[in-house]
Every structure is written in structure tokens, then in C-alpha cells.
Amino acid sequence: NTVVNNIQKNKQTCNGFALGVIDSDKRQPSYIKEFKEIGHSEHIKLMKHDSKNHFFIMIEPAMDTLILSCAAEVGVNMEDYELASELKDFTKITKDVDSKKDTRFKRLFKDIKGSKEFVLFGNLLSYLKNHKYDYDEKELKDYFDI
């Protein structure tokens, strides 16, 4: 909810480009209702504001589930990274850790970057970064058809 509120109310992003990554929480701010879905995969939904250049990449149901799913897809054993393989225990670790600095997560992300959902996530981020104001909705939809 913090990400959504910051994008909606921040003067710098209010009328410019904004991209947020959010979990698919049960209770979303009302601002989300102003967005339409461009495409979705098993865990990733791309949404665009009706009239503004605002995008959300919504992770369903949450980032920890996506990470565990990607690890399973590429055959990564979470214990090799000293991380839990059960969602409840893994979520506890992710809530207590600054994953940007944690070498376990750096190694894990490096090893799961070839998973289908991580590739999609990276492609969406890269495309939107390079096409902030000249995106093509069909090109964005095509990323989900791979």
C-alpha cells in the first residue's frame, strides 16, 4: 500500500512516469481500481493506469511465493543457500533480512534468474525503463505470450 500511495501522491510521479512493484494484497488502495490489466502470467500481472503513465507489476500472491516457485522450476535447493523451503518459514526470513545486502539472496537470485517468471519480470522492468513514454501495449502483451 505504501508503494501505491507514494506513486499516487508524489508530485514528481503524479503526472510523469511511475512504476511500482507490489504484492497482490487482499486489500488494495482504491487507486488500483483506476488500472487495467495489460497481461498476466502465473505470478506476475502488469497493470497500467487508465490515463496516466503509471504502471504496477503485481506479484501474485506475493514475492516470497514467486521466489520459491522460480527456485523449484530451475531445481534449486533452498537449503543450499541456508534458506527455508517452506513458505511460512521463508517468509519469516524475508521479513527479517535486508535482502539487498544478504549474500544468500544474491546467490539465490543469480541462480534462479533463468526461470520463466524471473525472465518475464526482468524483461518488463527493462522494457518500461527504456520506453517510459513511448511504450507499445501490444509489445508489452507479447511478453506474456512467450
Each model region followed by its residue ranges:
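Acidic, divalent-metal-binding catalytic cores of TOPRIM
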Residues: 1-146
